[in-house]
């Protein structure tokens, strides 16, 4: 089986080296990002960043889930990012 794959790759390289290189570069573009040390931090930042940003509303006192001010800290802290 490995001999057949090797023969196929040699034949492909002989006939269309540009396509082989483009497939290798595309494959590396898919495989390498999760191996990067920055991948861990980008995942942590994306988890801590709110998807929905607060909308200013007039608080009548009966809305416990609405912060009193739009800049009140809520959700996960980003202190770990400041300490890098």
From Swiss-Prot:
Pfam families xrefs: NADHdh_A3
Entry keywords, A to Z: Acetylation, Electron transport, Membrane, Mitochondrion, Mitochondrion inner membrane, Respiratory chain, Transmembrane, Transmembrane helix, Transport
Region named Disordered: 56-84
Topological type in the membrane: Single-pass membrane protein
Annotated compartments: Mitochondrion inner membrane
Subunit structure: Complex I is composed of 45 different subunits.
Record-given protein name: NADH dehydrogenase [ubiquinone] 1 alpha subcomplex subunit 3
């Amino acid at each position: 089986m490995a001999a057949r794959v090797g023969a196929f790759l040699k034949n492909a390289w002989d006939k269309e080296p540009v396509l082989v290189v483009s497939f290798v570069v595309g494959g590396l573009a898919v495989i390498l990002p999760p191996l990067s040390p920055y991948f861990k931090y980008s995942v942590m930042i994306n988890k801590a960043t709110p998807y929905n940003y607060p909308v200013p509303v007039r608080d009548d006192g009966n809305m416990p889930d609405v912060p009193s001010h739009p800049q009140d800290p809520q959700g996960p802290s980003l202190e770990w990012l400041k300490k890098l």
